[in-house]
Amino acid sequence: MESAIDTHLKCPRTLSRRVPEEYQPPFPMWVARADEQLQQVVMGYLGVQYRGEAQREAALQAMRHIVSSFSLPDGPQTHDLTHHTDSSGFDNLMVVGYWKDPAAHCRWLRSAEVNDWWTSQDRLGEGLGYFREISAPRAEQFETLYAFQDNLPGVGAVMDSTSGEIEEHGYWGSMRDRFPISQTDWMKPTNELQVVAGDPAKGGRVVIMGHDNIALIRSGQDWADAEAEERSLYLDEILPTLQDGMDFLRDNGQPLGCYSNRFVRNIDLDGNFLDVSYNIGHWRSLEKLERWAESHPTHLRIFVTFFRVAAGLKKLRLYHEVSVSDAKSQVFEYINCHPHTGMLRDAVVAPT
């Protein structure tokens, strides 16, 4: 049994774990491993917003343009494509890329092809919305958890290997305990989301400044290779409960500290649905996320269902990744998006 925290990220604890040293988890789970070379990763959520069937093809073309830009020098190591409908009834396509080298991501973002497209006046007149939500956590600022050991999705795809069975799971507080930084840091938030350019109510170009320790969770489900019994388990038992919880956070998450919640379905380049989905949630802090997870009936139902089936999973692939990041390592930029998109809803106007 291994610790979720890799050897080179271990340090003397000043903050204790939630369980005693002799704790034994009830079923096996694994985490992604990377060597000491990995100092920081970049998680880029690049969105296209549209409304209704009339704009769908133009939105797909814009999504495909973003994907093609990933083939430029310094593009991401892995990416995926998703669709979701938000709380305001808008459709959103997201291209999600992961870089294991922040300098490469910076070069890509500043390249003429990428920068000129984003800053072009054409973006303002196409009838589509665009957004960039980028977080770059350091190695000690994120954790992963998988119920399987191969072909890891998301940030796991830029890591080097999979751990052996790990200790820190199956109890409330285990998410925090898997963060290397949790050994010495409570990961408390600073400040508020602030509008630093533009006006969300007017649309156009808007830039939001984040704050330290925004928590970002991606929690995924892959039933593409599952056989009939597991497909039924997911579609009939897990999904309805999951959908209820995720819709609740999408529509009612603000008082709980949830800035944005999107339950997305993976798609191909033509917009066809795949049998893969995940939830992506931005929270004011890890503590706010924990409080909801440990106490709200919608998540408790999800947790109980997972506990009941976890030990018997064969081809149904369930996982999550959670990170916090520094304000200086975040980008939140929007073009023509409605004012409840992403970080726009909860951002306050910066004092002048």
From Swiss-Prot:
Position of the signal peptide: none
Note on cofactor: The substrate is directly bound to the heme iron. Calcium may act as a cofactor.
Cofactor needs: heme b; Ca(2+)
Superkingdom of the organism of origin: Bacteria
Reactions the enzyme catalyzes: an aliphatic aldoxime = a nitrile + H2O
EC category: lyase
UniProt activity-regulation remark: Active when the heme iron is in the ferrous state. Is very sensitive to AgNO(3), is also inhibited by hydroxylamine and phenylhydrazine, and hardly inhibited by thiol reagents. Not sensitive to chelating agents and serine-modifying reagents.
Gene Ontology MF term list: lyase activity; metal ion binding
Residues that, per the record, bind an aliphatic aldoxime: 219, 320
Active-site residue numbers: 320
Pfam families reported in the protein's UniProt record: Dehydratase_hem (PF13816)
Impact noted for substituting residue 219 to T: Retains 26% of wild-type activity with butyraldoxime as substrate
Effect caused by changing residue 143 to A: Retains 95% of wild-type activity with butyraldoxime as substrate
UniProt binding sites for heme b: 299
EC number: 4.8.1.2
Variant or mutagenesis effect after changing residue 279 to A: Retains 53% of wild-type activity with butyraldoxime as substrate
Temperature note: Optimum temperature is 45 degrees Celsius.
Activity's dependence on pH: Optimum pH is 5.5. Another high activity level is observed at pH 9.4.
Keywords from the UniProt entry: Heme, Iron, Lyase, Metal-binding
Subunit architecture: Homodimer.
Function: Catalyzes the dehydration of aldoximes to their corresponding nitrile. Aliphatic aldoximes are more effective substrates than aromatic aldoximes. Shows high activity with butyraldoxime and acetaldoxime, but only weak activity with the aromatic aldoxime pyridine-2-aldoxime. Cannot use benzaldoxime, isonitrosoacetophenone and pyridine-4-aldoxime. Is involved in the metabolism of aldoxime in vivo.
Similarity annotation: Belongs to the heme-containing dehydratase family.
Protein name: Aliphatic aldoxime dehydratase
Species per Swiss-Prot/TrEMBL record: Pseudomonas chlororaphis (Pseudomonas aureofaciens)
Gene: oxdA
